[in-house]
């Protein structure tokens, strides 16, 4: 039978790791249990930070939710919240209701208590609303909103503390991530776009209130808008980029705008393949010189196969050309060739159950003259190769040896094991 009672019980829920003690457990059915005069926690037994103590807790594993009557939430044994009725999730299924509160303490802010509420708006939208009380600062409100539509999706996070009692100023943070596709009658493929925006009321916000919205821990917060289109063998994109500087790092250049384009011939073995990349950027800075950079890189390669495609030799050459024009009136140019020669072998051994592959490879990279434009507009250079970016080209003469091996299942092609080793 699936029903019955157990007195003076200690229980553990295997699927969630939740555990507790109960004066009596009433097993109503296979998936529905009632716990009388009971406790509930998901903390590790060695460190029980919080605990829910209730007159009765009912757990419905079929629905994925639990409910408590006359419940007290304790943190480190100290009662911090009483509620006559409380619901909480048992698994990942979505349902509107209160989530477990959090409690903390800092020397500056004092006691810190949050009580989040989850709102399951619709199958493709949800929100979490979190009132927060910080003893010496006041009351704040945070919100998270997520949405998923057929042609776009995104997430919005925001937090506001009106008139911080310690500083007398409004404190806030805001973060938006949105991306989607735009269908147009004139274009074969949709335009894709993405917006990333994050800002703070002040540079001390993250240290005062914590990084609870998942903002980057780097010294800058990203503020970008991108639109991209590709069709067959060509692609074009446009970018507007700014930053909010959090730490002591130097202010990066804004890109207002950056335009990229690329085209490549139809790639095939045993024939000459062509490609070209180009970029225009207007760099903007509040204190340094503004500038424009024009960059283009044509490339050509030939993938010569032999031994029934078990081996190949691939020579390639490219020419990176950059031109800089500064608002001070000065200009400079840089032109750097890049030569590569790559060769490899492909071995495979098949058994009744597996396919084992082995791919040794050798690659020679050569940039004849070390050059530098004298400019450094990119804190993190979006390198066009592993050896040089658009602002510099160090002299390079490198031979790289590598070997890769895979073990695949014959039944469905699943990669069971992959290893590689490389030495320059």
What are these regions (language model features)?
Residues 1-41, 45-56, 60-424:
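Outer-membrane beta-barrel proteins and related beta-barrel translocases across Gram-negative bacteria
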């Amino acid at each position: 039978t699936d029903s019955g009672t157990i007195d003076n019980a200690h229980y553990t829920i295997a699927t969630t790791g939740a555990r507790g003690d109960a004066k009596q457990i009433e097993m109503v059915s296979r998936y529905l249990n009632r716990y009388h005069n009971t406790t509930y926690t998901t903390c590790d037994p060695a460190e029980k930070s919080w605990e829910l103590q209730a007159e009765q807790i009912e757990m419905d594993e079929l629905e994925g939710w639990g409910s408590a009557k006359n419940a007290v939430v304790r943190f480190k044994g100290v009662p911090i919240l009483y509620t006559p009725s409380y619901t909480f999730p048992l698994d990942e299924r979505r349902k509107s209701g209160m989530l477990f509160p959090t409690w903390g303490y800092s020397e500056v802010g004092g006691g810190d208590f949050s009580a989040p509420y989850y709102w399951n708006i619709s199958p493709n939208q949800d929100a979490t609303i979190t009132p927060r009380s910080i003893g010496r600062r006041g009351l704040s409100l945070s919100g998270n909103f997520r949405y998923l539509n057929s042609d776009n999706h995104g997430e919005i996070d925001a937090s506001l503390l009106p008139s911080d009692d310690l500083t007398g100023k409004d404190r806030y943070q805001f973060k938006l991530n949105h991306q989607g596709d735009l269908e147009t009658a004139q274009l074969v493929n949709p335009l894709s776009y993405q917006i990333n925006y994050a800002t703070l009321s002040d540079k001390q916000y993250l240290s005062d209130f914590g990084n609870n919205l998942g903002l980057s821990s780097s010294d800058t917060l990203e503020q970008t808008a991108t639109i991209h289109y590709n069709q067959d063998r060509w692609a074009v994109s446009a970018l507007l980029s700014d930053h909010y500087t959090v730490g002591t790092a130097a202010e990066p250049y804004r890109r207002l705008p950056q335009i990229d384009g690329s085209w490549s011939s139809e790639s095939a073995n045993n024939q000459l393949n062509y490609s070209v990349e180009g970029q225009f950027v207007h760099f903007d800075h509040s204190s340094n010189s503004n500038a424009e950079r024009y960059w283009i890189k044509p490339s050509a390669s030939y993938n010569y196969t032999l031994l029934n495609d078990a081996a190949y030799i691939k020579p390639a050459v490219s020419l990176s050309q950059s031109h800089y024009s500064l608002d001070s009136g000065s200009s400079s140019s840089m032109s750097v060739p890049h030569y590569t020669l790559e060769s490899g072998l492909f071995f495979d051994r098949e058994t009744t159950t597996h396919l084992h592959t082995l791919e040794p490879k050798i690659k020679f990279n050569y940039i004849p003259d070390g050059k530098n434009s004298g400019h450094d507009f990119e804190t993190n250079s979006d390198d066009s190769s592993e050896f040089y970016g658009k602002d510099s080209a160090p002299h390079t003469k490198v031979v790289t040896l590598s070997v890769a091996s895979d073990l695949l299942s014959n039944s469905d092609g699943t990669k069971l094991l992959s290893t590689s080793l490389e030495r320059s």
